[in-house]
């Protein structure tokens, strides 16, 4: 019976390590590909990933050494991991259930003022829109064709013959922002304060937490399962530190 529990703990540990490796890689990938203006969960991915990559390995050492002391260290460390994961999972759940933004943000009936609050404060929304202008994100990220750049960087209606891009798909706000050759009806505030833009920013933030939940939920379940199994295995040890190097 002990061998079966040990086998389940080993499998759960290996899966957790794989999840940790994937999350760490995802966080580092986010830092290189996602604009810092809307980058929200890259640090969370790296932190959780490193915890899952390192701490579950103690279970393998404890199993190999048949050490009660190592299991004790592992259990306390995993309790800390479960608290961290529980906090992130709760935040993901709140984001996912609070913000149900339409697939096409421009068709969302609610206004940004109805959605901003403690989760996404109004100052955060203002900071993102300011960042888009001053970092010239329309030049850098428009090719990704995400909703944020589609609705925040697209030329507003009513601009007449004045264009904000040199050729289709190539934005030139950087040049016009520097020389200030944009007429009043085509000002940056017109586009950045529109419903589609603001909803796209909120949706981009929420989507990152939703993606994080795809990892945090199963990881939290496996951590709790590993804790239960390791606690039952440790109860079978008679000595505080029973190092044998094999199973008996």
Curated annotation (Swiss-Prot):
Transmembrane regions listed in the UniProt entry: 8-28, 45-65, 70-90, 209-229
GO annotations of cellular component type: membrane
Stretches in topological domain Extracellular: 29-44, 91-208
The protein's name in its UniProt record: Tetraspanin-16
Keyword annotations: Glycoprotein, Membrane, Transmembrane, Transmembrane helix
PANTHER family associated with the record: TETRASPANIN-8-RELATED (PTHR32191)
Organism field: Arabidopsis thaliana (Mouse-ear cress)
Taxonomic placement: Eukaryota, Viridiplantae, Streptophyta, Embryophyta, Tracheophyta
UniProt keyword Ribosomal protein, yes or no: no
Glycosylation sites recorded in the entry for this protein: 96, 141
Cysteine-cysteine disulfides: none
Family: Belongs to the tetraspanin (TM4SF) family.
Annotated GO biological process: auxin-activated signaling pathway
Cytoplasmic side stretches: 1-7, 66-69, 230-248
InterPro entries for this protein: TET_plant, Tetraspanin/Peripherin
């Amino acid at each position: 019976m002990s061998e079966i529990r040990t086998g389940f703990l080993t499998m759960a540990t290996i899966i957790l390590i794989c999840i940790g490796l994937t999350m760490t890689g995802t966080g580092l990938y986010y830092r290189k590909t996602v604009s810092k203006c809307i980058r929200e969960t890259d640090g969370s991915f790296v932190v959780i990933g490193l915890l899952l990559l390192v701490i579950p390995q103690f279970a393998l050492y404890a199993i190999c050494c048949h050490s009660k002391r190592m299991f004790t260290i592992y259990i306390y460390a995993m309790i800390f991991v479960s608290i961290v994961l529980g906090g992130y999972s709760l935040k993901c759940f709140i984001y996912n259930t609070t913000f149900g933004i339409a697939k096409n943000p421009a068709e969302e009936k609610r206004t940004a003022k109805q959605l901003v609050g403690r989760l996404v404060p109004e100052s955060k929304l203002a900071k993102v829109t300011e960042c888009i202008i001053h970092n010239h994100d329309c030049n850098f990220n428009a090719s990704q064709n995400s909703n944020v750049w589609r609705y925040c960087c697209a030329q507003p209606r009513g601009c007449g013959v004045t264009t904000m891009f040199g050729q289709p798909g190539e934005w030139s706000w950087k040049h016009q922002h520097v020389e200030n050759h944009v007429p009043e009806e085509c000002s940056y505030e017109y586009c950045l304060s529109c419903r589609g833009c603001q909803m796209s920013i909120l949706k981009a933030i929420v989507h990152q937490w939703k993606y994080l939940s795809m990892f945090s939920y199963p990881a939290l379940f496996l951590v709790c399962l590993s804790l239960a199994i390791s606690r039952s295995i440790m109860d079978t040890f008679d000595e505080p530190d029973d190092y044998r190097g094999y199973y008996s």
